[in-house]
Swiss-Prot record:
Source organism of the structure: Listeria monocytogenes serotype 4b (strain F2365)
Protein name per its UniProtKB record: DNA mismatch repair protein MutS
Listed SUPFAM superfamilies: DNA repair protein MutS, domain I (SSF55271), DNA repair protein MutS, domain II (SSF53150), DNA repair protein MutS, domain III (SSF48334), P-loop containing nucleoside triphosphate hydrolases (SSF52540)
Cystine bridges: none
A Pfam family: MutS_IV
Record GO biological process: mismatch repair
Cellular component annotations (GO), alphabetically ordered: cytosol
Keyword DNA damage among record annotations: yes
Residue positions binding ATP: 607-614
GO terms, molecular function: ATP binding; ATP-dependent DNA damage sensor activity; damaged DNA binding; mismatched DNA binding
Amino acid sequence: MTEYTPMIKQYLEIKDKYQDAFLFFRLGDFYEMFFEDALNASQILEITLTGREGGTKEKIPMCGVPYHSASGYIDTLIEKGYKVAICEQVEDPKTTKGMVKREVVQLISPGTVMDERGLKAKENNYIASLYCYEAKEYGFAYSDLSTGELKSTVIEASEDRLINELTTLSTRELIVSSSEKEVLSDVMKEQLGLTFSVHEEDTIPVENEKLVTRHMSLSEKRAIGKLLHYLKETQKRDLGHLQQAVHYETSNYMKMDYYSKRNLELAESIRGKGRQGTLLWLLDNTQTAMGGRMLKQWIDRPLIDRKKIIDRQNDVSELMAHFFERLELVENLKNVYDLERLAGRVAYGNVNARDLIQLRNSLYQIPRIRATLLSMSSESLTELANQLDPCEELTEKLEEAIMDSAPISIREGGIIKDGYNSQLDTYRDASRNGKTWIAELERKERELTGIKTMKVGFNRVFGYYIEVTRANTHLLPEGRYERKQTLTNAERYITPELKEKEKLILDAEEKSMELEYQLFSEVREMVKDYIERLQKLAKSVSEIDCLQSFADISEKNHFIRPTLSEDGSLHVKQGRHPVVEKVMGAQSYVANDCDLDENREILLITGPNMSGKSTYMRQVALTAICAQVGCFVPAEEAILPIFDQIFTRIGAADDLIAGQSTFMVEMLEARNAIVHATKDSLILFDEIGRGTATYDGMALAQAIIEYIHENVHAKTLFSTHYHELTDLEKELSGLQNIHVSAVEENGKVVFLHKIKEGPADKSYGIHVAELAELPKSLIERASRILEQLENDDKKIIIASVKQPEEVHEEVQLSMFPVEPEKKASSKETKLLKEIASMNIMQMTPMDAMNKLYELQSKIH
């Protein structure tokens, strides 16, 4: 058995309790890692791997980072989904005999980050917990530790529902029991980008019982208990900033699954996965970090309560009507600090003097914001204004105590104002007078010795000294000057008078800094008493910030106030896609109408690729979402229903569905929509059926349309390349054909991007291929095939189309060798017709590969 050194034994004992984390083991001025942690961390952090004697024949792998710069390394590990256990020396090595005692003082994980550098200002950092009750329902709770937010609900015991909730929140970490983790699918565990943490205890800690209300269900309480226990065990400190748990119902908000939100690019771009080009990016003119976070919450959960929507609309109208007051409001909001996260850091004991200065400056703005809102006539804005708590006593205390120029460090003085504490003033006077005396001493000594270059200096090692260049040392009188330090070109001395004064000055400075830190700590503790009030203030300021952002964006982009229909009808005149219009410019964007009602429930959209079908469909959904978050909408006129759900199937397979084909994903999403949609829902289906054989796809598309028409009655926009489906208008009374128009000019196609009634007369697919700059010979061949197919009622065999005489090189697109004179078999005819009808430009690489496999299987 290996006999490790005492220090390595101590390390291994602590590491055994934190197997799923990197253990940052404090040794002097470094955090060291050993064994496997060292091997892994050296690669991830790109730091040097060394070795240390530890009682074994070979050196133990070791790497380390300086403690004063450790936060950057910790952030890197957390960002990659790892956990870090911070193990500190809890005894003073100078006064301890033998091994210094060490303990883990905090476990930092992706869901428990508190350092500002590891957080994004306008994004929440959520950690969630799950409790499965008899496989019937999930108790679900989540918190943003940095703000103190704590919420809970009960959801159906369905992995889809759980994924929707986790992705809506952009959850970083999920706490589950070991048995719960076992039943979650590998796809969910591997593809969501979550850190899973196993924790079994799920009763409410005694000190946190006040955070839970009686009416909550058992599963909900257990989920909250699991979350609170985990936070208590990992953070190892008071979590007094956690707010009372708020129960919410997912049914109180418009429902959209993860795929719909991604397809509509509400808060995350499909292309770069950032905010650029999303609805959130467009609507965000918030001036505060907490306002930005609330705006994302609003967009993630649009309202379905008519009164709440109208209240927000009224506030936006009022703010738009008071331009100059709104400008003043914006200027005041710019000076408001992140009060939510400040309250969290106060609870953690992590605030410095500059944080308190920013808090004070923020509180200065509150009476001004309140006065501006009260000058308007909106009842809800007046109510918001009256909720603004200026915390006057706290403001006065901070004004009285903290210097404007206070440093970041809280242990080196310069924080507390003169006049705040008489004892501190006494120490400061002694220090300042002593320094004045030293300056006078330098002048006198120069006169006495005649050495004009003589100077009095100070450093932390030797204290005060008189420095004389070596060339002038012979001018010093004997007896008074005691040599203290020898330099290359100078000598440093001390005199009895300087030695005496040095003690007085240094004692005063030391006592001053000790007292100043004590006074600062008292002020910081006082701020703790205001945490709850600051959190409530932050919510009110955030709401005001979101509303002014809506007003500003609506005015700048010429949005109008929508009317909410009572009968479920939708009528939009000259609607625009808000994000596309912003990117393209208002002059370039082509606006379109949209009308849906009980007699016109389904719009079947045809038209060429690149003509704007998908953009049109998305703009209808985004218009509805803008309305239901309380913002104005991009249109000339708009009458909109309140949608309970939006379902979309737009674009290729999503990367969340690992191992599924595009067609399988298509069918799963179609099923999700037609099973869960109601007459109050909106469905957007783009090219359903394209991932399988032509006739299969057409049959499925028709069946889906008929099912929605006969059973669901949801408002539906259905785009298709199957022009045969346009005949459904004759059979289905609630279906209307529309198309995106295009014209040919000089043999070239021009997309007008204008929606018109009726079906498209042709698809212009070859023109799109030409725009994509496919080889000219290929385009010519496709044109001839198309012409022959149209002339022969689509019964032509590809290989039988003769090449014109002027074409000298044979261009053979068929995958199958066919003799020129030989007539194709019926099997070959079907295959060739299928190839001819393929819409190549609409296919993803995966679609094309699937199609090739399918065709190949039909040959053999």
